[in-house]
């Protein structure tokens, strides 16, 4: 089912696709930023495959991300995540959404930078909180004060996310408006 209710500019999508060439477009950012939702719609607009790295990790491990964290700990999860990302980013073009901590892990960050153009969906705390506080599937938020934990993650991670090739502000607007902004950022990016 296509979530885009208004058509995305075909011209803009073509320009973005030309800019990408054979590279992947890799979405990074905190949980709740919209990496999967906007990534999936961006892939549709570009006519390329979409892969959610967390779903791929769950597929190969036959465990949920929460169960992996609980059973093996964050360090082992990050090692598996790095291996999965390396494999996913070997060929393109495709759109890949990553888990919130993927870009923080130095090994994963190297694979991501080598394998694609990075786009950070930067969101403010209140936007993220509104999106994530209704679910209990976020292992890092299983704390006494999850909103404070989210704010701490922002302080720790945002300087690293800022290394991304592109940044788009994630906020409460129609998804197709976000996709247009992503495509415009990609289309206007100068190839390195």
From Swiss-Prot:
Q: Which InterPro entries match?
A: P-loop_NTPase, Shikimate/glucono_kinase, Shikimate_kinase/TSH1
Q: What is its EC number?
A: 2.7.1.71
Sequence positions that bind substrate? 54, 78, 100, 157
Q: Which Pfam families match?
A: SKI
User: What cofactor does this chain's UniProt record say it requires?
Assistant: Mg(2+)
**Record SUPFAM superfamilies:** P-loop containing nucleoside triphosphate hydrolases
Per UniProt, ATP binds at 32-37, 138
Q: Which GO terms describe its biological process?
A: amino acid biosynthetic process; aromatic amino acid family biosynthetic process; chorismate biosynthetic process
Does the record carry Translocase as a key word? Answer: no
Any idea which UniProt keywords this protein has? Amino-acid biosynthesis, Aromatic amino acid biosynthesis, ATP-binding, Cytoplasm, Kinase, Magnesium, Metal-binding, Nucleotide-binding, Transferase
| Alphabetized PANTHER family for the sequence | SHIKIMATE KINASE, SHIKIMATE KINASE 1, CHLOROPLASTIC
| Name of the protein in question | Shikimate kinase
Q: Which organism is it from?
A: Rhizobium meliloti (strain 1021)
């Amino acid at each position: 089912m296509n979530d885009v209710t208004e058509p995305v500019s075909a011209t803009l999508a073509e320009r973005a696709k030309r800019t990408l060439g054979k590279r992947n477009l890799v979405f990074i950012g905190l949980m709740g930023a919209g990496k999967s939702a906007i990534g999936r719609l961006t892939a549709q607009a570009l006519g390329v495959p979409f892969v959610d790295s967390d779903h791929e990790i769950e597929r190969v491990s036959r465990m949920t991300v929460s169960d992996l964290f609980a059973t093996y700990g964050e360090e082992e999860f990050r090692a598996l995540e790095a291996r999965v990302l390396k494999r996913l980013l070997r060929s393109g073009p495709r759109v890949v959404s990553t888990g919130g901590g993927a870009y923080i892990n130095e090994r994963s960050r190297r694979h991501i930078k080598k394998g694609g153009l990075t786009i950070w969906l930067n969101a403010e705390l209140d936007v993220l909180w509104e999106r994530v506080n209704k679910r209990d599937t976020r292992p890092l938020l299983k704390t006494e004060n999850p909103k404070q934990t989210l704010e701490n993650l922002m302080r720790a991670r945002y300087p690293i996310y800022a290394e991304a090739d592109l940044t788009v502000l994630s906020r409460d607007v129609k998804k197709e408006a976000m996709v247009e902004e992503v495509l415009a950022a990609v289309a206007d990016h100068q190839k390195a």
